[in-house]
Every structure is written in C-alpha cells, then in structure tokens.
Amino acid sequence: MQPILILIMVWSHSIFAEEVDDLYISLVPIPDQTLASRHQGINDALKNVLVKLTGNSAVVQLAAVQSSLKNATLYVDAISFEALPNNLSIYDNAEGLNLGLRVNFSHSAIDNLIRRSELPVLPSNRPKLIFWIVRDDVEAGRRLLGKDTKGASFTDADEQLMRDLSRVMKDRGIPFILPSLDLEDQLTLSAEEAWNLASEKIEIASERYGADAWVAMRFYRSSNGKIRGSWKYWANNKSYFDDFGMESDVSFIPPVINELIDGLAGSFSYVPQKTKNVLIVKVFDVQSLDNYKKINEELTRLELVNS
C-alpha cells in the first residue's frame, strides 16, 4: 500500500488549492515604445515572473539572477503593448504611466533558469488565502473590512487598500478571498477578536470559506500620521506574527503583503533538483481506460512530475 500513501501525501499538501494561470506573463508600465524602454520593461517583467514563480521577492537580489537579468530578452517568447488597467497600484506605477508592456516568457527557459540557480518553486496549484483586515479609526472605532464593505466609514484610503491588496495578490499569483462579513461572520468573529488576532476564533470563522491559510491584519494611524500595525498568518498548522510601520496608508499594503507572502509561500514551495530522479508509483485496481486517463492527468498536473 506504500505507493498509494505517496500519492496521498502529495495531494493532501494543499487541500483547497487553486490552479493559477499566467505565471510566465507580466504586464509592466513603460514610458514609451523605444528600444531602451522595451529592454527595461522586459527586465522588470522578468523580475516579476521570477518572484511570482518562486514565491520569494528576495530572489531578484541573488547574484545568479542578477546576471540573468542582464540578458532578460533571451527568455522572452513574445511582447505586446497595451493600455494599463485603471486598478494598477500607485506602488507599481508611481509615475502615473498609461502604456504597458506585456511580456510572455518561455516556460522551458525560465524553468531552466530556476533549476540552474537553485531557486525555490511555488507550484501552480497554489494555496488560497482568506484575509481578515481590521482598521482602528478614531471616529469609526475598530472595523473589519470585507468584500462588500460600504458605508460612510468606508474611506478612500480603505478603497485604495482593497485595490492594492488585489493588485499585489495578482502580481504574486496567489488566490485570495475576503470575508463577506454577513451575520454568520459577525456572530463568529467580532472586530475586537480580529484586532486581538485571536487565532482560534479566526480559524473557526475561516472554515466556511475553504481556504488553505488565513491572514489577519490590524492597523491604525498614529498621531503623527504614520501607519502602525501587525499581522499574523496561519499555514500548515503553524502561525507567524510580525509588526509593521509605514509613513502613509496609501501605499503601505504592497510592501507589507509582499513581506508576508515571502514567508507564507515558503510553507508551500520546494527546490527543484538539477538531476532527475525516478520514482515508480504503482496504482492498483485500475479497471477501465477512463480511470487510467484520470490517473495520468492527475500525475502530470504535479509540478514535480516530468513524465
């Protein structure tokens, strides 16, 4: 029965995980269509793709990656110009550019770069996260922010926060959801409990959403205008906590979430080997051609399997 146990271990790594597409594609802002702008755009796009594939933003600082960035065009399959979407984060497009460069990279070339540089890989079958975000406001008090949050206390800064969160998670290729904050959520988890980062309460409130991991984040604006906060996440039966402080609430989400994802993704990633290993898996009671096809499809979906 050992072969069956091996398969169970692989599939149970992330029960509710979702398949993520476009991991080898990046859209970046550029000032114009000149050759210099295209080269810089391709360089930026390669950084984005490597961060998205590895789950770690620090990889672009490695010497092996830096040398590859100098020849980023070697990894390109196709490029195209297009207008940037309105929801592009101010953090990603600080100069307010309107033109974007979409870069499609070669799967095999990028995979070889990752293997050669011994970088981690976050599989395309990725964990789905749920975010519990609570803001402490002088006038409105402590208040959870969800996907349907509206009302007078929902500020422009809150709206920007939601856009930034959505953009960062898309850039990182991580599926996520926000709670609906309906009556069931309100009865299960109060804003005060979320503010206290009460793990047991947050875990119970997250169960109905079928997420692989949860993230709780609290923040407030101090008297000097700076943003202060903390976050905690739970993944693979382990929890992690950290504090953060930023100058402004307009763009604090991208750096905070990127740091958080760097740590969380490590629980779901692996480092591919330079040499190929062979594992013989025996599957019993395959009684039809249809069953055989389904088994093949499931095996070939695994990042670790080549053939």
What spans do the regions from the language model cover?
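N-terminal signal peptide c-region/cleavage motif recognized by signal peptidases
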Residues: 12-14
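N-terminal segment of the mature soluble domain
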Residues: 42-68, 127, 131-195, 295-307
